[in-house]
Amino acid sequence: MKIPITQSKEWQTLQNDLKETSFFEKNEIYQYLAILKKTPVGNYLFLPYGPVADTREAIQQAIRSVTELAKKHNCIFIRIEPQLDDCAKYLDKIAKKVKDISPIDTWILDLTPDEATLISNFTQGTRTCYHNVPKRGLAVETTKDQDGIKHLISLQNQIFKKKHLTGYDENYLKTELAQPFATLYLVKYHHPDTNPTNPEEQTTDPIPEDGQVIAASLFFDHDDTRYYMQSASDQRYRKLPATVALLTSAIFDAKRKGIKQFDFWGIAPEGADQTHPWYGFTKFKKSFGGSPKHYAGTYDIILKPLKYRLFEKSKQLKKFLH
C-alpha cells in the first residue's frame, strides 16, 4: 500500500499536537487515520485521502471498521477520500458525493531520472528562469526555526487579503513546522554585485530590500514522496523567478535525499480553461514536467440522516451569513 502523508502515523502526531482527537488503524490489507470533527449539530469522522487499501474489497473492510468506530463515538457521518482508482462506482452506491475537501487532481513529478534529464523536461520558460536565479540575486535557505513562519504568514496575508480569504493561523503553521517531516524554504533577495550599465538592462520594476524574503513554502516528506504544501510569494516582485528558485531547490534537495517523487498537491481538473481559479498555478506546476493523478474525491457515508440534513442546513446558513 502506498500511504499518503495524511493517513500516516506521523500525521496523527500532528493532529495530537493540534489538540485534535484521532484514531489510527492498520492491518495487512488496509490503513486509516480518522480525525474526529466536532460541530454544533454533532460529530463526524474525516479520513483525508483515506482509507488506504490496494483493492476494493479491502476498502470495503476498512469502511466497515471505521463505521463501527463512528457509531461508537455517536457520529452523524463519515467523510472519506480513498485514493484507489476503481472505487468510485462502489462509493456512489454507499455514500453521497460532496464537494471535494482535498484536491481531487494533482501533479506528480518522478524524481528518479538524473538532474540533467529533469531540467530538460522543464518548459523553456521555466528552464530559463532556473538558470537565471543566481543572476537575479536570489538565494534559497531551509530552516526548522519557527520564527521563519512569520515570513510565510506575511506573504500569505498579501494574497488572502486581496482575495478576501482566511489563511492558516500562526500556531497551526508553527505546529506543522515542528514535525520531523516538515521543512520551511525561504527565498531571499540579495542585491547583485554589479548594476546594469546598459540602459536597456535597467528596469523601473520594484526591487526588494537586500536580504528580504520574497517567497516561502512548507514541504513535507513522507516515505518516497515530497509534498508541496502551504506556499506564498511577494506579488510585488513577480518578475523575479522566486517561485522557480523555491521549487527547483526543493525538487533537487528531495532527489539528493533519495525521495522518488514530488507531489505538487493540487491542480485544476483536466480541460479547465482560464476562468478556473487554479488555472494559473496549474500551468506553472506543469511547467516542471510530470504527469497527472486523479482521485475518487470526497464522499459522506451518512449514519444519521436527520442530523446530517441539519448539518448541511447549518453549513448553508453559515455561508449565507458570511
Whereabouts are the PLM-identified features?
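Short catalytic/ligand-binding loop motif for oxyanion handling, primarily in non-cytosolic enzymes
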Residues: P40-Y44, R79, D86-K89, E270-A272
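Short, high-confidence coil segments that cap the C-terminus of an alpha-helix
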Residues: E20, K72-C75, R256-I259
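A conserved beta-strand-loop-helix scaffold within acyl/acetyltransferase catalytic domains
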Residues: M1-V41, L84-C87, K93-S102, I108-L109, ...
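Aromatic (often tryptophan-rich) hydrophobic motifs at membrane interfaces
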Residues: A62-V66, F181-N195, P199-K304
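A cross-family glycoside hydrolase active-site/sugar-binding cleft signature
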Residues: P48-G50, E81, M229, W265
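Non-catalytic accessory segments adjacent to catalytic cores
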Residues: E57-D105
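Active-site/acyl-donor-binding loops of N-acyltransferases
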Residues: P4, L14-D17, T21-S22, K38-T39, ...
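Glycine-/proline-rich flexible loop or hinge segments
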Residues: G42-D54, C75-F77
